[in-house]
Structure formats: C-alpha cells, structure tokens
Amino acid sequence: MFSPKALPKRTPLARLALAITLSTLGLPFWANTAQAHGGHADMVPLQAGLEEFGATVKWDDYANLFTIAKDGVYLKVKPDSKVAMLNGKRIELTVPVVFKDHTAFMSTDFINQVFQSGLDKTFVVETRPNPLNPLSATEITTAVDIVKKSENYKPGFRFTEVSVKEPPKDQVWNFALTGQNVAQPRQASIVVLDGKHVIEALVDLDSKELKSWKPIEGAHGMVLLDDFATVQSAVETSPEYAQALAKRGINDVKKVVATPLTVGYFDGKDGLAQDKRLLKIVSYLNTDDGNYWAHPIEGLVAIVDLEQKKLIKIEDEALIPVPMKPTPYDGRGRKGVEVKPLEITEPEGKNYTISGNSIHWQNWDFHVRLDSRVGPILSTVTYDDKGKKRKIMYEGSLGGMIVPYGDPDIGWYFKAYLDSGDYGMGTLTSPIARGKDAPQNAVLLDATIADYTGAPTAIPRAMAVFERYAGPEYKHQEMGQPNLSTERRELVVRWISTVGNYDYIFDWVFQQNGTLGIDAGATGIEAVKGVKSKTMHEDTAREDTRYGTLLDHNIVGTTHQHIYNFRLDMDVDGEQNSLVEVNPVVLPNDRGGPRTSTMQTETKVVGNEQQAAQKFDPSTVRLLTNFSKENKVGNPVSYQLIPYAGGTHPVAKGANFGKDEWLYHRLSFMDKQLWVTQYNPEEKYPEGKYPNRSDKDSGLGQFTQDNHSIENTDDVVWLTTGTTHIARAEEWPIMPTEWVHVLLKPWNFFDETPTLNLNSPK
C-alpha cells in the first residue's frame, strides 16, 4: 500500500497523534498569551515542526510573510495575524504565528487547522482492498518467515523478488468493474538466491503455507545491493589490484570507486566460466570534486567471483593517465541565477482522488503499484464514456531496457546494461524531490518493497502524481464569432530510477481525450572514457574519438543506445483484439476531372506473432482493433500504437551492431519496435525472466517461436523505443534530460470528440 506524503486522516485520534508527535520531536513548548478557545495555546517552533511534517517553509523578509507548501496546499501567513491565505482563500487562524527570540512559533494545532481544512479530498479510504495491491510490510515479513521456517531454507539465502502473485486476469477485471472479490487467496511470488542457484517459491498468505519450491536450472540471478559492497571490498583487499593502481600513480585504494557490471555472454571468448556468478569491475578515482565519473581508471578491468567474494582476474591493457581536471556538476564555483518564484496552486483542491493504490481522474480509473524490477505497474485502466466504463488496458509497465555501448576496447566491449532485468530498477528508485523532480503541487507516494534479506523496505517519495496544463485541447476562431478554445489538462504518474551514472524518468501521461502517453527521459552523467587527447587537433584525437565524442580534455563520451521496451496488455473494449495496418497510398483518379491521382488507404490484418514483429515505419498507422465493437457509424473501435512519437535524440531504429553479435541473438527485442503476442501471464519481460549471462533469447524471441495467431484474441503489445546517444559537449558534466515518447491514441474508439463537455456550461 502507498503511504502518501500527504495529509493525516481527519480523525480526533490522528490530530491527537500529530500533537503528540510535535511534542516528541524535541520541539520546545511554551504557552502563548494569545487566547485559544478561551485558554492559553501551546506553541512550537514553526520551521522545524513544518519541515518534519514534510512541508517547505520560506520567509519573505520584504513582504513580512511565510509561504508554506505541501502537496498542493499553499499557505501565506504573516506573524501576529489571525488571517491567512490558503490556496488563495482567506481562512481564520485560531492562534496567530508569533516571533519569540527571533524564532517563529506556531500553535500545536496549526498543522491540523491548515492541512485538515477540508479543502483537500485527495485521499479516500479504500473500503475493499484491491487484489493487485502490493504486499504490505507485514505481508512481506510473513511470506519471508514462511520460507525461512521451511525445510528448504538455508542461512545465507538472499531474495531477489518478494511480490504479490496476481490472480487470474478475468477475476481482476471482474473486481475492477463489479467489486466482486477474486477467488484466489492472497499469495506471494518469491525468488531466492542460494549462492549461484536460483529458486522460485510460492507462499499462500491466507493459509500460511509454502505452496511450491522450484529450482531454476541454468539461471543466473540479479545483481543485488550487497554485491556492490562485495566488489568494493574485493578491490580494496587485492594486492594485485593495488599493483595495477600503483602503475597509474594511485596509491590510496580507498579513493577508488568500484562499479559492479554484468559480464554478458560471448560463448567463452572472454575466457569466463559460464557456471560462475561473476561481475566485472571498472573503477573511478574519487578526487573530492563530487564527480568521480569524470576520472575513469581506463584500461583496467577486474573480475570478481561473488561466491568466493574475491577478485579472481585482472585485465590490464593500456596505461592511460587518469583525467584529473576537477569537474563538479553541482554548481560550485558558478554564479547563481536569480529566478523569481513560479507557484502552482489548486485553490479548490485536486481533481483526482487516490483510494489505496487506485487513482480516479475525470474519466480515467486505474491501479498502480511499484515493482522491484520494472517500477510502476498500471492495471485495469478504464475510461468512463458517458457513464459506461470501457476497458483500455489490463496492465502496462516498463518491460525492460538495455543500454549497449559500441566500443570494442577491453573496458567497454561487454557493456550492455539490462538495467531492470539485471539490477532491478524498482529497487533503485530515486526519491522524488518536490519542486525539482516534480512540481510543487504533486502528491508524493511512498512504496514498500523487500530488500535482499527479505526485510520490508520503505522507499520515500517513490512516485509523484500531479495534474498539469498541457496547452489548448482545441481551438477555433470563426470569422465574426466568439473564439472557442479550451485548456488541455494531463494527469502524470512519475517515477525515477538511478542506475549507476544514469537517472531515468518515466511518465505515464493521461489526457482527457482518451490518449495515454509514456515518456522516458534519460539524465545523469555520461559514461566516459579516459583518452590521451586534450583537443581534436592532436595526432591521437582521430583514434581516440573513433567510438565517441571528445567532450573535455582527456574525456570521450562513447556512442551507445538507450532502448526501452514497454509491455502493454491492451484490452481495447474487451479482450478480442487484432493488429491492423493502415497504409496511405496514392492511386490513379478514375472518376474524371483535372486531378490525376487520389489519396486512399489500404487496410491489412496481421495474422500471427512473427508477422507482427516489425520495424517502426512512421508512414504506417498501426492499430489494435476490436472488430466485435463498433462506434456509432460502424467503424471498429481501435487504439493507435505509436512506439516513437518524437524525441530529442536520434531514434534507435534498431540494434546498432552486427547480427552475428551474441547480444543480438540473446536480446532480439531491441531490434524491432513493435511486437504483439498472444496473452500469456508468464511472459512478463522482453529480455526473459533471467537475462543475466543468458546464452539464448528467453524473451520475445522465444515467446514468438510458436507463432500464435493474434487475430481476435487476447493480445499483448510490446513497444520498443529509444535513442542512439551520440554524445555532445552540452551534456558534460551532467546531461539535460533527453526524452523519447510513446503514444496510445483512440482511433474510432469514441463516437465524437470526447472532450466536447469541457466547454459545457458549468
């Protein structure tokens, strides 16, 4: 369940608890002479109390007022005044804010009065728990305890997954539409690592039983957070590695930052045993400038055996001096920019409600939970069309992603990061900073997942939900008539994951007109290579920049790709869907007149999974169509599938390497932008469930081998998008966010413009 960073429940018990909390924060009380309901008021320091509550506090010395903000609630209050402005509306304070000894104090009831004012109705009590709700902290503990008490358990087991086991799809849809409970008991899916061995378990939380225990042959598990500490320790305690560092003039191993990287698969040509649990280590030098990524220790790779917890091999190639130029990215030493405040207020509260993990906004309803591997999973997405809830998508999430590099050198050839499949992007969720990562009016939601020990771990501010202005929805100015235009609003669900040097921002964007967008943004710090060249005018520059761009003295940003795949279990007005291609064509005019040609369209139904695996062609309209449902004029209802709806980098048209590469054969999902498969609840990830060191394609390449029919069936759409990242100077030392966009757009799904009511009289 989410723990919203928002308002306490409006109950006397909650208000009492809040007052007790303030008193236990170490905040000194004093009795103000101001009367509160006929008696003295107990006062606490305003700034400390509000910041502990999660609000931001700003003092304007010129205007002599405080601006206090939290979750879209904005308060402007002056000292010694019983009147404040709450989201632009005047409210009466029981006790004014006062100064004493240069410190502002508020009454112990101030937070309750302001944030319990009744303006905010965002959070609604969940009366019937959703069967897709993520496991609570208690459920995680219970599930792991059941495993630990079983005869199968051994000390040292680690957990890569503890998640809710989804009930059958038809039961979940029935719950979403009618409220009828599912038949399946509450269950937990668990993946355990026993050394290098992977085991899948299923726990029944109702009966408190271990229902299954299944070793998975040949699988290598995910990289866990404690593996980071293992490789750092292995590097720091290796005499051989210390010698290699000394050759480069580095004598303090504590200044070396080791990064744990998966080794990939090269059919033994890399000299690594396939049955070992290994990581490669590329290191950086911490020079105290706050950016060790700018100081790569080039030409040196260590290999660590995670079971032995020691370094087993060193690959020491070229002696390239470590770039030592200070390269901070936090603004130090720069003149600050004066920016006037930009405030977003919602004076009458929010237009959406959150009940448990379910969100309602205008005509949209959906459920969202955070997964430790792929991040947010959106489920049972429906649109209320004039009083009728219509199915659009059963489940949508990031399926997987890969970041392959194109440099063949010893420290680079193996770099092809499966960020979600190898590292778990949900586990690496980056807490969202209000006013920076998301607007001030966002509601921030906590989430709970299991760590590698199986213990529940709370992630603060894991996701943001906010409404925003998005330009005009439509406009027309008829000559001699009043202008007609209306504002477009969007609801955004945002999540950020930091995987090493890169930070990824994912937005699920709901539009009032039925369009659903997915935006993926890459920011953070480029993975750079140390080289000899300082400028492009040196003799070494041509070879140094063969696989990248010279960004700074002795620094090359290597060319690579960011390829994302989204798993979208679309149910367009039901489960009987088909993939349709619509191609605009030029045909001769056979009707007479001066024109010689016409524009027409040709329509084709795609029959099977292998025919559906296609490169993106922007001139073809691709639809997921329900031929059993029609709009008012008889056109079958559809949603358009647009895997690349624009971006700020060159589009990744496919995998930028030869088809004889092992990477190509293991991970074919990245070379096609559209895949459609027949629904199978076990097919979750485009790279397969266990891609680490895999020697074959266990994802979409395998899923489509049977070549099932996708006509009038329950289909899953997999959209691959992304960018080919050619580095540029403006991205160093930190990269402005670069976006790529996916769109799912209604196509004859409605009978008319679905937002005509936006201009209806209120």
Regions found by a protein language model. Name each.
Residues K154-D206, D252-L306, Q362, V493:
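Exposed beta-strand-loop-beta-strand "reactive/processing" segments of non-cytosolic proteins
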Residues T56-A63, L75-M85, S117-V125, K154-P155, ...:
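Extended intrinsically disordered, low-complexity coil regions enriched in Ser, Thr, Gly, Ala
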Residues E51-M85, N152-A188:
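N-terminal, post-signal-peptide region of Sec/Tat-exported proteins
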Residues P131-A176, L224-G268:
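Short, non-transmembrane alpha-helical segments in secretory-pathway proteins
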Residues M1-R10:
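N-terminal secretory signal peptides that target proteins for export/translocation
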Residues L205-L210, K214-V223, A246, N286-P376, ...:
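Extended effector regions of multi-domain proteins
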Residues F2, R15, L25-R128:
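Primary recognition of N-terminal secretory signal peptides and signal-anchoring hydrophobic helices
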